[in-house]
Amino acid sequence: MSSVDYIHLDDQSIATGGTSLTGTAILEDRMDHILSLSCQDLTIEEVQRYQNKLWIIGNITNLYRLDPNIIHELLSNNFFVKIEFDYNFCPYRGEIPHQKLANQICKCPHDIILNPLISSTYDLIIKNAKHSFFMSERQRAIYSIHMPLMRFDKTSVLSSCFTKNTFDLLKTHALNYKNNQYAILEGYGGWHSQAKGVTEAKNFCVTNNIPYQILPNQSYDHHIETLSKFKGLVFMPIIDDTCPRCVIEAKLLNLDVLTNINSQHTTEGWWNKSLEQIEIYLKNRPKHFWKIVDENCHTNAS
């Protein structure tokens, strides 16, 4: 590895899934200068050792399991940016799951009774983050409601991001022969499948006489190849899904995309442009991230 300039902190330093794929794409161009750490293994020694590096902090649910002193040290004395993939300020990961799973209106992160550590953590993030990045405009708007002290001039919207290899993979399969069916992703069972609206997607297809097939979970490359052979994708999440990759992948594969307002990026201007313009926009998002980092996020070592 080359010299370490950045510390990437996330719930899992190496993982699969949309969050990990987007995180990898954002960091791809400088991966040789990034050390990845997982929240659950973070120590006070590591926080202090890399005090002069820029920390790139992603999902932090596992951070709440640590000694609060470690969190305070990290967010008070280190340089960091925060990437908000979903709704880490809530233990249920958002307003809708909070309502459905706890039967309560979400007042996070400042519901002290529910989880004071989340509240104090986000107070420090809002106060000390050099910049915060969001997946969609509507996600950022929800954060601003829950954290009214958040400064918009220190925030940006990225969207989901894709590696160069993923763009190549999507382009390879975009011209595949399409059958006459619509795909519904099966999810990972339990609450995940419920949140992703599997039942709602099935009901939508039945109501509208749309032939569909449930797509089982596969390795990423096989998933893209299989998905590419469908006429379209039906995705009806019941939660605020900040910028679901699956609908972007489907669009870049030339599929008809049927989704709802809970796919939060679909109200943004870039989503309704041509495939070529969408691809250009998406390819520039990691560059946008690093441009902001380079211009605004200096450390003592810079």
List PLM regions with ranges.
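N-terminal pre-catalytic "stem/leader" segment of glycosyltransferase-like enzymes
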Residues: 1-62, 66-68, 77, 90-95, ...
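Active-site proximal beta-strand in glycosyltransferases
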Residues: 54-59, 74-113
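Short Ser/Thr-rich beta->loop micro-motif in glycosyltransferases that lines
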Residues: 85, 234-239, 260-262
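Membrane-proximal helix-turn-helix segments that form the acceptor-binding/catalytic region
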Residues: 100-132, 228
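Acidic donor-binding loop of glycosyltransferase active sites
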Residues: 228-240, 255
